[in-house]
Amino acid sequence: MPFPDFDPVLVQLGPLAIRWYALAYVAGILLGWRYAVAMVKNPRLWTHRPPPVTTEQVDDFILWVTLAIIVGGRLGHVLFYTPQIIWTDPLQILQIWNGGMSFHGGAIGVFLAIILFAMRNKVDLWRLGDLVAAVVPIGLFFGRVANFINGELWGRPTDAPWGVVFCNERIRETLGWCPAGEVARHPSQLYEAALEGIVLFLILRWATHGAKLLNRRGVVMGLFTTFYAVFRISLENVRQPDAGLENLPLGLTMGIYLSIPMLLFGLWLIWRGMREETPPALAPADKPA
């Protein structure tokens, strides 16, 4: 099927262009923020431990997360996928508006932000990580949909009836050619939006609201890390490898290599958290109002 004639720019205000990709980041951060606040306020989620942070601390942490996503995502993309620009065109590192963000880099940035915020505010590192992990799929969903609208990070060629030809007149006029060619490809961005966004959100929603796993330190973060890695590794088989990284050792992609440590870390977090003894149930007066 032909690629829809999406305009990556939502609104053009003189020299200022508001892009769908930027809007996806804003929507993911704002909705994730409100969801985190709602979780902190929900006493049914904190039956054995009080929330790790107050709603005011969640508000403060949003700035940390936003900076961590942008800086970590951009540096991760440069280091993992385009390290050559460090020497050939270092100013390009700052050109975020031209695209190029890495989930794995953003994840490292957010984890460092969690560590620093926890140390500064004397809150439990693993439990803050659990709260953050529960909301991340919201941002992943919007980000992958924006990738599709931008016509980037497409999949491998396919004969499936839902294959998309990522080429149209707008792409030709903007770039002068169609980088994806004129063959039908897997819409891998939408696969990722479904698995890393919707399915992963539902898994973590069950973990937090159904199984009450916020009472076990690090388990929700472990579930997020494990399932994200499993989904990403699986979908790398239908996602087109990044240019210049098609011939990595063992035939694996950069996404797989970066996800394997996540998988191991996630399994360790789950194992560690499930072995830890759960404290006694909180008295009603100790639960969040």
Swiss-Prot record:
Keyword entries, A-Z: Cell inner membrane, Cell membrane, Membrane, Transferase, Transmembrane, Transmembrane helix
InterPro entries: Lgt
A GO cellular component annotation in the UniProt record: plasma membrane
Top-level EC class: transferase
Membrane topology: Multi-pass membrane protein
Chain sites annotated for binding a 1,2-diacyl-sn-glycero-3-phospho-(1'-sn-glycerol): R144
Pathway given in the UniProt record: Protein modification; lipoprotein biosynthesis (diacylglyceryl transfer)
GO process terms (BP): lipoprotein biosynthetic process
GO molecular function: phosphatidylglycerol-prolipoprotein diacylglyceryl transferase activity
TM segment ranges: 13-33, 61-81, 99-119, 218-238, 250-270
Pfam families reported for this sequence: LGT
Domain of life: Bacteria
Keyword Cell membrane tagged: yes
EC numbers on record: 2.5.1.145
Main location per the UniProt record: membrane
Function: Catalyzes the transfer of the diacylglyceryl group from phosphatidylglycerol to the sulfhydryl group of the N-terminal cysteine of a prolipoprotein, the first step in the formation of mature lipoproteins.
HAMAP family per UniProt: Lgt
Name of the protein described by the UniProt record: Phosphatidylglycerol--prolipoprotein diacylglyceryl transferase
Species this protein is from: Phenylobacterium zucineum (strain HLK1)
Organism lineage: Bacteria, Pseudomonadati, Pseudomonadota, Alphaproteobacteria, Caulobacterales
Gene (UniProt): lgt
